Design a protein with these regions (language model features):
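Residue-level detector of conserved catalytic or cofactor/ligand-binding positions
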Residues: 1-5, 163-172
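A short glycine-rich, His/Asp/Glu-containing loop-to-beta-strand
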Residues: 4-30, 100-146
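Glycine- and acidic-residue-biased ligand/ion/polar-headgroup-sensing regions
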Residues: 21-41, 50-51, 149-165
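Generic beta-strand structural signal
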Residues: 24, 44, 50-52, 62, ...
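Short beta-strand His + acidic residue motifs that chelate non-heme Fe in jelly-roll/DSBH
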Residues: 35-38, 54, 61-70, 145-148, ...
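Tight coil/turn sites that cap or link beta-strands
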Residues: 49, 57, 140-144, 152
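Ligand-binding loop in jelly-roll beta-barrel domains
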Residues: 57-86, 169
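Long amphipathic alpha-helical segments that form oligomerization/scaffold cores
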Residues: 82-109
Length: 172
């Protein structure tokens, strides 16, 4: 499951304390700042490019609240069902700075590796209950990205088209 929230009126309230169990949540911030606090004692501010990996196991209570006064908040949260044998484990919280992510860069693209491996770049978290592959791919114009999804994996692609051009200048 992927949750993406772009509702400007909605994010101001954030997500006050609420429980999870039996899942892993992987939150990747594209823009903005979020404050995380949970029942394991973990607390911190996620900023653009950072990853929060929460393994809820037998249960965790956490909150995610905006840590910014203005601007747009944009991020993705992937929910991964934990195998039955892991659902009684002690919860864990991992905070990964954006500069710790694996990164592949060539003339056509940048691939930030949140989990898994692309070319020689690897995601920083290796202790997985499943074998996730999670990339943020930035393509140059008219370029493409190809990746063979391993047999047995489920997959999805979220595509966001952003075209950046020079601003038009008007003379008055």
């Amino acid at each position: 499951m992927c949750i993406r929230d772009r509702n400007k009126d909605d994010y101001v309230a954030g997500f006050p304390p609420h429980p999870h169990r039996g899942i892993e949540t992987v939150t990747y911030m594209l823009n903005g700042e979020f404050e995380h606090q949970d029942s394991t004692g973990a607390k911190g501010i996620m900023t653009s490019g950072d990853v929060q990996w929460m393994k809820t196991g037998r249960g965790i209570i956490h909150s995610e609240m905006p840590a910014m006064k203005e601007g747009k908040l944009l991020g993705f949260q992937l929910w991964i069902n934990m195998p039955a044998k892991m659902k009684k484990n002690k919860p864990e919280y991992l905070y990964i700075k954006g500069n710790e992510l694996g990164k592949h860069e060539d003339s056509e693209k940048i691939v930030k590796v949140i989990a898994g491996k692309y070319e020689k770049a690897e995601g920083p978290e290796k202790n997985h209950n499943v074998d996730p592959i999670y990339f943020h791919v930035i393509l140059n114009e008219k370029k493409e990205f190809n990746f063979d999804v391993p047999s047995g994996h489920n997959s999805f692609v979220y595509l966001s088209l952003i075209h950046i051009s020079e601003p038009t200048r008007h003379r008055g």
